[in-house]
Amino acid sequence: MGDFLVAREPLQPSDTVIVLAGNSIYRSQYGATLYQQGLAPRVIVSNEPVRTHGLDSTWWELKQLGLSSIAVPDDAILAITEVSGSTFEEAQHSRDIMRREGWHSAILVTDPFHTRRALLTFRSVFEPAGLTVIPAPAEGSKYKTDGWWRDPDRGIRVIQEYIKLPYYLIKRQI
């Protein structure tokens, strides 16, 4: 059950890495790693508020202050300026940036338990626009496909994903 949520495909060079919003440092760290490995010359990040450790900022502001884990030069980062209330909206905003920049391919970084729904969502938005996306589950994440039910936080996340999958299907967002 935990394995199904994790989507993996071989990584290949792309036009950009997209790091999805969320309060997981592993996403931004892995996005930076993929950039540093030369898999993409640009990184798209969300500019959502940071709601962890009592911070009142955004990921982009933290990056500019040198406090973010995204070790990527500022000129290689594009921030989604619109507020995204869902993975579907992040996909739409990312698609718009990619069209504007003339890009065609992306590597999608998110937590492992989120990759299945995120990939289906992004493909539903990207494919009609002629764009491609490859999933990249964030390395270093504490999510484990076995024994997830033993940890209340992980258990809640898995259950939430299994609720969101049919919801997104019904809403035609995947």
Give a label for each model feature.
Residues 2-150:
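A structural signal for short, hydrophobic/glycine-enriched beta-strand patches
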Residues 151-174:
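A transmembrane-helix-recognition feature enriched in membrane-embedded lipid enzymes
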